[in-house]
């Protein structure tokens, strides 16, 4: 009996792993996961809370988008900026994934249609601002089947973070109202104090913290000193000529300086 049980668990694990990779390929076009992604996804599919610290462009979104596709119900994603929501939703829809963003930039008819789609279970991911989530918690969320909560830019919840948003502090009510729904908090910037504050304020239950490497081998920092004002412009021009077919950004100390350099 013990051997049979182990074999069943092994088969279930392999089947889930196969399903995850098939979903990754068919919806997102990738053949393999980036470091930590697969582990985070398994953790979330097991209905466990987590805090994910990954650099920008490190693949945070797939950590909750893929579990949303493999779970019953709708994933609710809290995002602070309408522009970020729109970008995510457009990308998901282009990949054939039912997603929408409930926010103040929509007209009321569009928001009403989104609410209906959520209640009827036709959306896999709903993006929403913290302010809108608070307003909808006793109405829309109550009538939805929710697979998971993803709190993007989670450092906004902490006064120790660099981008504190008071509305984020009310996200702690999610576990109180929906104790069975797992929460994944994601950020690209949080020191130890901020991470502890995120976990405390969101009331995460025995969360696992995943910290990805922030090493960017394709990025280097080179400081050149000793230029006079006129020499700086000449040095910039020479640098641009050496990298004529490449992309780049020139940062200046003021708007006037930006116009002069341009």
What are these regions (language model features)?
Residues 83:
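Conserved catalytic helix of short-chain dehydrogenase/reductases
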């Amino acid at each position: 009996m013990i051997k049979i049980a182990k074999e069943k668990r092994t088969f279930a694990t392999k089947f889930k792993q196969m399903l995850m990779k098939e979903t990754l390929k068919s919806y997102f076009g990738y053949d393999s996961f980036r470091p930590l992604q697969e582990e985070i996804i398994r953790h979330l599919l097991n209905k466990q809370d987590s805090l994910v610290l990954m650099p920008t462009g490190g693949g945070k979104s797939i950590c909750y988008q893929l579990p949303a596709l493999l779970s019953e119900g709708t994933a609710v994603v809290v995002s602070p900026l309408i522009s970020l929501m729109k970008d995510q939703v457009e990308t998901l829809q282009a990949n054939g994934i039912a997603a929408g963003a409930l926010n103040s930039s929509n007209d009321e008819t569009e928001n009403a249609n989104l609410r209906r789609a959520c209640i009827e279970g036709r959306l896999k991911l709903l993006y929403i601002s913290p302010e809108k989530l608070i307003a909808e918690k006793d109405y829309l969320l109550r009538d939805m089947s929710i697979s998971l909560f993803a709190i993007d830019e989670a450092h906004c919840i902490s006064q120790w973070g660099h981008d504190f948003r008071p509305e984020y502090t009310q996200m702690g009510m999610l576990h109180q109202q929906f104790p069975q729904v797992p929460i994944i908090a994601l950020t690209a910037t949080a020191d130890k104090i901020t991470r502890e504050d995120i976990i405390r304020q969101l009331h995460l239950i025995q969360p696992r913290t995943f910290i990805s490497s922030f090493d960017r081998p394709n990025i280097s920092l080179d400081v050149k000193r000793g230029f006079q004002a006129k020499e700086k412009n000449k040095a910039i021009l020479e640098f641009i000529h050496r990298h004529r077919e490449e992309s780049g950004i020139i940062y200046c100390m003021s708007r006037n300086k930006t116009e002069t350099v341009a």
